Amino acid sequence: NNLTDDRDEFPCGQKAESDAITSWTQGDAAYDFTDLQKQAHEFNASSKYFRKGVAMMPVCFGISFTKTPMNQARALVHVYTDGSVAVSTGAVEMGQGVNTKIAQVAAKMFGLDLNGVKVHTTNTLRIANTSPTAASAAADLNGKATQMACEAIRDRLFAVAKDLVEAKSIDNLSLENGFVHRNSERTSLDWKTLVMDAHLQRVNLSEHSHYATPGINFDWTTAKGHPFAYHVYGTAIVGVTVDCLRGRYEVDYVKCCHDFGSSMNTSVDYGQIEGGIVQGLGWMTMEEVVYDADGKLRSNALSTYKVPDIYSIPKEIA
């Protein structure tokens, strides 16, 4: 077969570090592509005006901006004396859930629940020179910057907690469920008390961090390099019904097997996959960019550019 595996090399020279074969075989095993084809053929044999079709398609997508300088992000984290945490990053929340993931990063680093973390809207006064929220990289870049800022504050807090709980080293300490843990056992020192004690000792409870994706490069002259931090893989099986008399169609189902990696939030990631499916269907079936003879964009409004709506959503997404 011609599916990417870890022996292959992309046109830019970067070697594949994982493969698409797993998602293909697991998708086929879960949904039985051969049986779905059989069902479509049986339907078509007895239907005069409607026809069903089914296709199986793999995908491989590199994560990072190919313009290397864009692969950087900053985060500003404040811990207040009441124990609350504020985070600012360059990521723009537009319904895709990136702020939820960033809040999860801070909450995990400080051993808090999400109610204790507030992610503020993007503001160039707090976070300057931001990279675009695009290329499926916003959560990676800004989440990592948030992690780095939280780690710096946490280490300073551990230096205070070390004496309060009589730990031999800060390496023996952790923050879980609002308490300091020593050697994985909960102590009586809670988060708010630790923060206040640190403040009284004039410890810095704020941090600005900068993250740049390591190990990536791309030469636009030779079109060679290592432009992506990693690749994600997936496979989709799509079934459609075409009304041959009226020239209409419906998407009956989309069945996916996608590489999530270690998902921070499966609900957000499922939503991203479902949204991507509908966007892809729109791109392939109805969206068309039209320019006139003078080069002016004519499809510049919803009245001239058709985008997917509720009726475009597949009947089943699995």
What role is predicted for each listed range?
Residues 99-100:
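Conserved strand-to-helix beginnings and helix N-cap segments that scaffold or border functional pockets
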Residues 55-96, 230:
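Conserved beta-alpha junction segments in alpha/beta enzyme cores
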Residues 1-59, 104-318:
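C-terminal catalytic domains of large/alpha subunits in multi-subunit enzymes
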